[in-house]
Amino acid sequence: MSNRKYFGTDGIRGRVGDAPITPDFVLKLGWAAGKVLARHGSRKIIIGKDTRISGYMLESALEAGLAAAGLSALFTGPMPTPAVAYLTRTFRAEAGIVISASHNPFYDNGIKFFSIDGTKLPDAVEEAIEAEMEKEISCVDSAELGKASRIVDAAGRYIEFCKATFPNELSLSELKIVVDCANGATYHIAPNVLRELGANVIAIGCEPNGVNINAEVGATDVRALQARVLAEKADLGIAFDGDGDRVIMVDHEGNKVDGDQIMYIIAREGLRQGQLRGGAVGTLMSNMGLELALKQLGIPFARAKVGDRYVLEKMQEKGWRIGAENSGHVILLDKTTTGDGIVAGLQVLAAMARNHMSLHDLCSGMKMFPQILVNVRYTAGSGDPLEHESVKAVTAEVEAALGSRGRVLLRKSGTEPLIRVMVEGEDEAQVTEFAHRIADAVKAV
């Protein structure tokens, strides 16, 4: 990937009011994107957002820029990121734009693009947009200006799409489900999907006010969900993040079920139904218990770099159809084009309904290994601690002691002088001691 000025691996993101998430920048971005995308023929762009208060300001700025370039905007209102990808495909729009900062706090926001087929924009198009940003903004003739309109049935369309990924012969009528929508974009979607499939639904995190997205609710903080599942004696809980591309679950005992366990359940069910093609893709952070459990089932497993973008790239490279991060991004290419929390959750619910098993029992075939993470700061000018012989020696000792039943992963932070030490194995006390031994070696450099 070339050096970008604005686009990161997941679009453009930052604190609202600070560059680049300012009204003037976003207007210019809309104009530049419009100039580039207009070359491709269609003049429609879908714009969706999550529930952040800044979404109103940013969608107006985007629309003004697009209109100046001669493109029309179709607004969805608050809508999950995967819904925008789906609507972009079905409306055959030239692109879809999501205004969201996913699981971040309300004061952050971001802009992410989807291409006409519901996948990430090609690098070449992002680079062309960046090149256009360097030019002086101009306006097409008045007769050529773009317009804005609203897709009034956007939510209904996406609800039907989600329901269609759940087998017709199954029902959720025997399940009591607590759903936590993080006060985010799934608040008017997920409870309706589950109710229409027959579930008894208790909804929390469904009262967005513009500033409470992801605040002590949702996939990044499941404590409220765990408490409610136990209080209601529910069969399970499902949590989404602010833009609905992540899902984390909670079993009837209040235990957290993460993206690794969700992928295990879906992959095993695919194997049982004769629908699994190839293997499954995780990341460097995926639990070793997942790798061993899939191996026992004869399902190939590969690790990608951390980030759903890299998971998708590895899936495409291998020709596989399922991938996930332990954070809850689950990509099911047989169902959709991007990570979709609602669709992934429905596949787990289908496995529960088909096998008449609890979520707790479906997870029992996979033993999660203790994973200990230690962050170690180092002096930026002191060179790379990971290249130091003493660190290499201690790491080699730990790897030898763990053998094939554990892992060591050392990663440098991309944003600060920090080494992330991760040690994984069967014995938590031993793994903790090993992690701190490596951390001490890094500190001593």
Swiss-Prot record:
Residues annotated as binding Mg(2+): 102, 241, 243, 245
Active site: 102
Cofactor: Mg(2+)
A single GO BP: carbohydrate metabolic process
Phosphoserine found at: 102
Key words, A-Z: Isomerase, Magnesium, Metal-binding, Phosphoprotein
Enzyme Commission number, as recorded: 5.4.2.10
Enzyme class, UniProt record, top EC level: isomerase
Keyword rRNA processing carried by entry: no
GO MF annotation list: magnesium ion binding; phosphoglucosamine mutase activity; phosphomannomutase activity
CDD domains according to UniProt: GlmM
Cofactor annotation remark: Binds 1 Mg(2+) ion per subunit.
Catalytic reactions on record: alpha-D-glucosamine 1-phosphate = D-glucosamine 6-phosphate
Post-translational note: Activated by phosphorylation.
Cellular component, GO annotation: cytosol
Pfam families reported in the protein's UniProt record: PGM_PMM_I, PGM_PMM_II, PGM_PMM_III, PGM_PMM_IV
InterPro entries the UniProt entry points to: A-D-PHexomutase_a/b/a-I, A-D-PHexomutase_a/b/a-I/II/III, A-D-PHexomutase_a/b/a-II, A-D-PHexomutase_a/b/a-III, A-D-PHexomutase_C, A-D-PHexomutase_C_sf, A-D-PHexomutase_CS, Alpha-D-phosphohexomutase_SF
HAMAP family xrefs: GlmM_B (MF_01554_B)
Protein role: Catalyzes the conversion of glucosamine-6-phosphate to glucosamine-1-phosphate.
Family statement drawn from the similarity comment of this UniProt entry: Belongs to the phosphohexose mutase family.
Name of this protein: Phosphoglucosamine mutase
Source organism of the structure: Escherichia coli O1:K1 / APEC
